[in-house]
Amino acid sequence: MRWYSYVIPAVILSIIAISGVWWNATLGTRLDQKVQLFLNEHSSILNAVYETTTIVYTEPLHTSVSETITSTSFVTETTTVTPTVTATAQELSTLNPHPENSKIVLLMGSNAQNDPSSPLNPYIRTIIKNRRDYAERHGFKFEFLDLDEYKPSIGDKPAPWAKIPMIKNVIRKYPDAEWVWWLDHDALIMNRDLNLVDHILKHEKLNSLLLRDTEYFSGFGIDSEGFRTPKNQDPDDIHFIIAQDFNGINAGSFLIRNSEVGTWMLDFWNEPLYKEHNGVFVEQQALSHMIYSHPIVHKHVGLVTLRSINAYDSSDPAWGYEDGDLCVHFAGCFVFQTCAQNFEKYGKIITEKQGHDWFDPSEKEYIEQRLFPQP
């Protein structure tokens, strides 16, 4: 009767497997319930009235001008948007609705400086200086935050979740900021002369960059086949700018507007149920679910090309860094153990253009030896 000893473990494993399937199957329902509660609590931002399949809501939009413009839009289940433009909005449309440079915050978070075993540890102060120099060159604000100080706010969850409380704290520190640009620590700004406002945020520039009626990719296990960006998207409706690769959206580099809608999206993204589910791609998977499942989020997320804000170390012309691009992100370098190799490859390019002054003094000698070894 040896087979009897295997029955109990088999039953336990079966229960675990069935529970996992149930958890995934019911996640959408539970999130929808939480979303509805959240929307009800935030009626000052999205004042929704439900009539059959149509949602009508009034939404305050934050602009660089010191006013709040109220614009009424109609969003159906197919996310068709028909805006009603107010007289004030008509008047402001003749202006140039882009933020002043001083109202941009470049944000970076890391704990590589505290961890000698991190592959970025020998370079992290130079990476910080790379960001600070760029921000100062264009009159932007720059904030570096220590990831270790944010671990209590995320508990035992993966480190990428810390970027949400970091962004919220920066918004509290700079209440007049228009946009926050989050850029992961495994990245370098390559073109110091390319102004983020001119490159992305000016109304006419963003209008030309938005990928309208473009398919969203997903490697997250989310059924997104046939799901596309809005056909008609006004830059003034965009409160979150991000790019995607073959795995779907990549949150290594994105911009979020400091507006009621932007902060609402941060709160929504920080939903505990997302953290409990916690898929392979962590916070990116949660953001993908938000975009795919909720028309309000879908409307306010602007998809742009990867190379415009998040170029990779890749030979693919759609994703790979080319001379003149704003930045390069070493996506996946911790997994493939290529962080040091990537930094040295692109650090050498920067040095050939800018000289050696971009190194942090405390790391200069080591980096010079790595980039330009003596025989």
From Swiss-Prot:
Specify the species: Schizosaccharomyces pombe (strain 972 / ATCC 24843)
Q: Which family does it belong to?
A: Belongs to the glycosyltransferase 34 family.
Its Enzyme Commission number(s) read: 2.4.1.-
What Gene3D superfamilies would the database entry show?
Spore Coat Polysaccharide Biosynthesis Protein SpsA, Chain A (3.90.550.10)
* Keywords, alphabetical: Endoplasmic reticulum, Glycosyltransferase, Golgi apparatus, Membrane, Signal-anchor, Transferase, Transmembrane, Transmembrane helix
Localisation per UniProt entry: Endoplasmic reticulum membrane; Golgi apparatus membrane
What is the protein's given name?
A: Uncharacterized alpha-1,2-galactosyltransferase C1289.13c
Query: Which GO terms fall under biological process for this protein?
Result: protein N-linked glycosylation; protein O-linked glycosylation
Q: Which residues lie on this side of the membrane: Cytoplasmic?
A: 1-2
Please list the GO terms describing molecular function: alpha-1,2-galactosyltransferase activity
Identify the main location. Answer: endoplasmic reticulum
User: Which top-rank group of organisms is this from?
Assistant: Eukaryota
EC category name: transferase
| Segments on the Lumenal face | 24-375
Record flagged with keyword Transmembrane: yes
Give an example GO cellular component term for this record.
Answer: endoplasmic reticulum
Q: Pfam families of this UniProt entry?
A: Glyco_transf_34 (PF05637)
What are the TM regions of this chain, as residue ranges?
3-23
Stated membrane topology is: Single-pass type II membrane protein
